């Protein structure tokens, strides 16, 4: 029984953009809410990898830096004062006889809740580090796996290895301020948005594809140049650089959640149009969710979060209204 413990109406696992907006909407539905985040700060992948990237796929916002978006989402989420728990990875899931769900963290702390919203993105993210014996020597010096501050690359000769959307975006962001930007990709086709790839190819960015990194050349703790190899001909070339950025993708893992009995499809958590999973009282929103015609944009997640909250409210109180009143009429908001 959970009668001797504080029980929340909703516990949101994940403090990224979707989890934060869902926390705000929980307040709109007058639900006692807790947010549990694995990282030491809120913001998820946006704060971790794209703090200065300009996000342009949210209606009404022509462009906003990732960290500014997170700042505004945190301010919005704080409106109804949800409890925030950082630095805890949820590993255990148990349902008590009275229906209360017990979430246990890897630190052994237990969280009691009536419903759960999974806003975990693609799970825990770890970068694929460079497969080179010398990589660890240079990591944190001038070998980078993410671009935290664009200005740190100002007037520098930068080489980026990678061909996904993140690598392309970094190239476009750095091109106006760096002395030079060179992008290496092992395939001729790039994985970024067509418009972003076209912008990169029109710019001063030197695009070398198909090429791969062959060797890091340096003394002490800094890389001075890289040897690259044309994948078809095998011809090598040496490029001098100031900074090397690696974006070879991520290791993505739902971790212990895979053992909770959730239905997994294509590496994500299967949901219906109400964001319900196959487990009663457990809902999902954002990149973690999989359903037909899923829109993989932050804007899409901003719809899924409130949908999951409304479903949680209906689960707790079948007689409740289907959705919250509009924010323009909410007494707490209009009096601020």
UniProtKB/Swiss-Prot annotation:
Membrane-crossing residues?
A: none
Task: Report which reactions are catalysed by this protein.
Answer: 2 reduced [2Fe-2S]-[ferredoxin] + NADP(+) + H(+) = 2 oxidized [2Fe-2S]-[ferredoxin] + NADPH
- Name the InterPro entries on file: FAD/NAD-bd_sf, FAD/NAD-binding_dom, Fd--NADP_Rdtase_type_2, Ferredoxin-NADP_redctase_2
Top-level EC class, please? oxidoreductase
State the superkingdom: Bacteria
Identify the stretch annotated as signal peptide in this record: none
User: Per the annotation, how and in what number is the cofactor bound?
Assistant: Binds 1 FAD per subunit.
Any Pfam family hit? Pyr_redox_2
Binding-site list for FAD: 37, 45, 50, 90, 125, 287, 328
* Annotated EC: 1.18.1.2
Gene3D superfamilies associated with the record: FAD/NAD(P)-binding domain
Cofactor(s) needed for function = FAD
Q: Which SUPFAM superfamilies match?
A: FAD/NAD(P)-binding domain
Task: Output one GO MF annotation.
Answer: ferredoxin-NADP+ reductase activity
Which keywords, in A-to-Z order, does the entry hold? FAD, Flavoprotein, NADP, Oxidoreductase
Q: How does it assemble?
A: Homodimer.
Q: Which family does it belong to?
A: Belongs to the ferredoxin--NADP reductase type 2 family.
**Name of this chain's protein:** Ferredoxin--NADP reductase 1
Q: Which organism is it from?
A: Bacillus velezensis (strain DSM 23117 / BGSC 10A6 / LMG 26770 / FZB42) (Bacillus amyloliquefaciens subsp. plantarum)
Question: Lineage, please?
Answer: Bacteria, Bacillati, Bacillota, Bacilli, Bacillales
